Swiss-Prot record:
Keywords: Manganese, Metal-binding, Mitochondrion, Oxidoreductase, Transit peptide. Expressed most abundantly in parts of the plant which exhibit a high metabolic activity. Expressed in pre-shooting flower buds, vegetative buds, immature fruits and fully expanded leaves of basal shoots and seedlings. Residues 1-24 form a transit peptide. Belongs to the iron/manganese superoxide dismutase family. One of its GO terms (cellular component) is mitochondrial matrix. One of its GO terms (molecular function) is superoxide dismutase activity. One of its GO terms (biological process) is removal of superoxide radicals. Mn(2+) binds at H52, H100, D189, H193. This is Superoxide dismutase [Mn], mitochondrial. Its EC number is 1.15.1.1.
Length: 228
């Protein structure tokens, strides 16, 4: 019940690494990174990447699995108050797992194409919807810097409107909470844990430098697959 209010079963399953069945309940595991922790330096330090992946993302996975198991037990017992109480934990930790699983794919070392501008249909779509790649970067940087507290800034494909849009989400809310037709192409984590060890409290510097390791190839692949 609570899961359906977060995202569809299909959305949850996509790219998140199921690992086993636990009493009929599917659980999740921490995905491996497709590069070494230090591979994104100097844009993002190896220390940040290791802490971000091994500690923060792992905590979301652990707490998500725990909340899902508690939900499973509560439903089996007909414990409606506990079911309702678990909704926020499932949304927060499940969203954290979804968002970070996308985030790691949105990054790539420079030697593997990180930072190279998007080409093909995504490049054309960016020019059409925002005027230029530079204008898109400025818009996402501005909205990410202005986001109060913690959250994410996204480049998304709106499949209903058939256009690219920039959205922000608070805390660990996944993009789907902003609309069921939004497909995340690129998400940038603006929680302090994503940059504080290196950039202190200067979020704009982090936002400026992360574009040097953005994996536009992955974003283009998602766009090609999902574009109507």
């Amino acid at each position: 019940m609570a899961l359906r209010t977060l995202v569809s079963r299909r959305t949850l399953a996509t790219g998140l690494g199921f690992r086993q069945q636990l009493r009929g309940l599917q659980t999740f595991s921490l995905p491996d990174l497709p590069y070494n922790y230090g591979a994104l330096e100097p844009a993002i330090s190896g220390d940040i990447m290791q802490l971000h992946h091994q500690n923060h993302h792992q905590t979301y996975v652990t707490n998500y699995n725990k909340a899902l198991e508690q939900l499973h037990d509560a439903i089996s017992k007909g414990d409606a108050p506990t079911v309702a109480k678990l909704h926020s934990a499932i949304k927060f930790n499940g969203g954290g797992h979804i968002n970070h699983s996308i985030f790691w794919k949105n990054l790539a070392p420079v030697r593997e194409g990180g930072g190279e501008p998007p080409k093909g249909s995504l490049g054309w779509a960016i020019d059409t919807n925002f005027g230029s790649l530079e204008a898109l970067v400025q818009k996402m940087n501005a909205e990410g810097a202005a986001l109060q507290g913690s959250g994410w800034v996204w480049l998304a494909l709106d499949k209903e409107l058939k256009k690219l849009v920039v959205e922000t989400t608070a805390n660990q809310d996944p993009l789907v909470t902003k609309g069921p037709t939004l497909v995340p192409l690129l998400g940038i984590d603006v929680w302090e844990h994503a940059y504080y060890l290196q950039y202190k409290n200067v979020r704009p510097d982090y936002l400026k430098n992360i574009w040097k390791v953005i994996n536009w190839k992955y974003a283009s692949e998602v766009y090609e697959k999902e574009s109507p």
